[in-house]
From Swiss-Prot:
Other noteworthy facts: Although related to the sugar transporter family, it does not transport sugars.
Membrane found in the keyword field: yes
Record's protein name: Probable inorganic phosphate transporter 1-9
PANTHER family per the UniProt record, alphabetical: SOLUTE CARRIER FAMILY 22 MEMBER (PTHR24064)
Tissue specificity: Expressed at low levels in roots.
Alphabetical keyword list: Membrane, Phosphate transport, Symport, Transmembrane, Transmembrane helix, Transport
Extracellular topology ranges: 45-75, 125-130, 187-210, 329-354, 407-415, 473-485
Its biological purpose: High-affinity transporter for external inorganic phosphate.
Protein topology in the membrane: Multi-pass membrane protein
The species this protein was found in: Oryza sativa subsp. japonica (Rice)
Recorded family membership: Belongs to the major facilitator superfamily. Phosphate:H(+) symporter (TC 2.A.1.9) family.
Gene name linked to the record: PHT1-9
Main subcellular location of this protein, as a coarse class: membrane
Region (Disordered): 519-541
């Protein structure tokens, strides 16, 4: 292996500064939009049911009572967004490695903004047309959100220093918690305003303006994302992509010097040359060909297949109980609020959003912050195992006495505490670590793609959990209207707990630890093991030759102005023949 490029070492050792926190906010907006979209849909569907499923078309067919959105429609609105997220993870993850993180980052944000606005701007007033329009734009929203997952994690991992990389990526992911909180706040504000404006209508009286309320809630999710578009587009390409994928050390150094105030270009260059002087001169000076093996090639599977399986499988197993628990909220909050027949559409949506805000403040956000504090102390692997174990314990505690006790005592503090601890454990452990690990384990040229594949597996698990749980939680002999008979809530919770134990076992067997190591060290350890198995067949001096030649250019460029630096770089056509500009 060639010695490490010093600009990347300097990036690993850089002090935490303003730009790191700015990057957290910029990168976190996609996750913010994701959780806003996921959690606002429950209260939105309450209003939607009152508007488009009037009492005469209620689910039970009695012609009385408030309109209710059928379970199949709820599943469709959730499922299309998750399917879009699967596609977005795969497509934008691959594009992030092929054309650069920055180039497709803005496209994801624009797609999220436009589809959020489109979700509420449907001009249709009939039920079928409104549903078709809503599902179409929610699919596009899912594509944008899914694409943001690998790009946000990869960009933050490549900008962060070694000491706080895990905490920074966890901070990006914690924006989901604030998305839940803002979603609840916006829903409560809109519902309260419309309720007051319409004179607090009777429970079965749904004003025509309610059709506007749910649209405003959906469109409001575009505002925070739109506000960060300028800063997202002004970000430079990550140094690791520029240096390791585009193989342009000079430009990488220049880009990082613009955003990290304490990076001394001349000092970095001097360290590079000093390190090169201590190394034996390279045998070969021409640049080597770009790495020949591709994604899913035999060599890729040998070197990275185990890690990709560990990341994708853990994320898949996590999202089944995590998204199922999100849908389980309806069972939790129902005893605490008046029945739907005694409140109007705005009040029902307000109550659902209020409960979601309580859960977010009590368990979800504290779980994210606990992960940020512990990720660099306990490590990713230990936190993931601990989180899976705690989730299983709390789900079993809910499942065991459910039929005999919890079903008739749902309005107790212990019931909500156990449910909240399930969310806390997920966010403390696997919900955060499954987002971090794929951004640390893979080489720069596969990093975004592999993160996207892992995230896509997670969204498939979410699809299984969100749709499967709606069926499985129904009683065999007493399914709710619009549902097929299932296995019952108690057995459904037991299954979710068992899935968490399976995630624990998989993490123990397959997941490596990445704490305290640079991204290049994580990659080197995998390649070294592969080279030992191959008898060192991948060793060579070609990369040393390329690096030795670039060091001289780097030393010269560090003492020049940016204009001279660009001119010097452009004259290096024999070294980087495919690069035409900075």
């Amino acid at each position: 292996m060639a010695p490490r490029i010093r600009v990347l070492a300097a990036l690993d050792q850089a002090r935490t500064q303003y730009y790191h926190f700015k990057a957290i906010v910029i990168a976190g907006m996609g996750l913010f939009t994701d959780s806003y979209d996921l959690f606002c849909i429950s209260p939105v569907m309450k209003i939607f049911g009152r508007v488009y499923y009037a009492p005469s078309g209620s689910v039970d067919g009695s012609g009385s009572g408030p309109g209710v959105t059928p379970p199949a429609v709820v599943s469709a609105t959730v499922g299309v967004a998750l399917l879009g997220a699967v596609a977005g993870n795969v497509v934008f993850g691959a594009l992030g490695d092929r054309v650069g993180r920055r180039r497709v980052y803005g496209a994801c944000l624009l797609l999220m903004v436009c589809s959020s606005v489109g979700s509420g701007l449907s001009v249709c007033r009939t039920r079928r047309c409104a549903l078709a329009s809503l599902c179409f734009f929610r699919f596009l929203l899912g594509v944008g959100v899914g694409g943001d997952y690998p790009l946000s994690a990869t960009i933050m991992s490549e900008f962060a220093n070694r000491r706080t990389r895990g905490a920074f990526i966890a901070a990006v992911f914690s924006m989901q918690g604030f998305g839940i909180l803002v979603s609840s706040a916006v829903t409560m504000a809109v519902a309260a305003a419309f309720d007051h404006y319409t004179g607090y209508p009777a429970p079965l009286d749904t004003p025509e303006c309610a059709d506007l309320a749910w649209r405003i809630i959906l469109m409001a999710g575009a505002v925070p994302a739109a506000l960060t578009y300028y800063w997202r587009m002004s970000m430079p390409e990550t140094a690791r992509y520029t240096a390791l994928v585009e193989r342009d050390v000079v430009k990488a150094t220049n880009d990082i010097g613009r955003v990290l105030a304490d990076l001394d270009l001349a000092a970095v260059a001097e360290e590079e040359v000093a390190a090169a002087a201590l190394s034996p001169p390279p045998v070969t000076t021409p640049p080597p060909p770009r790495p020949s093996y591709g994604l899913f090639s035999r060599r890729f599977v040998r070197q990275h297949g185990r890690d990709l399986f560990a990341c994708a499988a853990a994320w898949f197993l996590l999202d089944i109980p995590y998204y199922s628990s999100t849908l389980f909220q309806s069972q939790i909050y129902r005893p605490w609020f008046p029945p739907a027949a005694k409140v109007n559409a705005f009040q029902e949506a307000f109550n659902v959003a209020k409960f979601q805000a309580v859960i977010a403040v009590a368990s979800t956000i504290p779980g994210y912050f606990a992960a940020m504090l512990l990720i660099e102390r306990a490590g990713r692997r230990r936190l993931q195992m601990a989180g899976f174990l705690l989730m299983a314990v709390f789900l079993f505690a809910l499942a065991g006495p459910y039929d005999g006790y919890w079903r008739d005592h749902a309005k107790t503090a212990g019931y909500i505490v156990l449910y909240s601890l399930t969310f806390f454990s997920a966010n403390l452990g696997p919900n955060t670590t499954t987002f971090i690990l794929p951004a640390e384990l893979f080489p720069a040229r596969f990093r975004s793609t592999c993160h996207g594949l892992s995230g896509a597996a997670g969204k498939l698990g979410a699809l299984v959990g969100s749709i499967g749980f709606l069926w499985a939680s129904q009683q065999k002999d007493g399914a709710a209207a619009g549902h097929l008979p299932g296995i019952g809530m108690m057995y459904a919770l037991f299954v979710l707990g068992g899935i968490c134990l399976l995630g624990l076992a998989l993490t123990y067997a397959f997941t490596p630890e990445t704490m305290t190591r640079s991204l290049e060290e994580n990659e080197s350890s995998v390649q070294a093991q592969s080279q030992v198995g191959d008898g060192g067949s991948d060793a060579g001096n070609g990369s040393d030759g390329l690096r030795f030649h670039e060091l001289n250019v780097l030393m010269e460029a560090a003492t020049k102005s940016p204009v001279s630096m660009a001119s010097s770089h452009l004259s290096m056509s024999p070294i980087l023949p495919h690069r035409m500009s900075l």
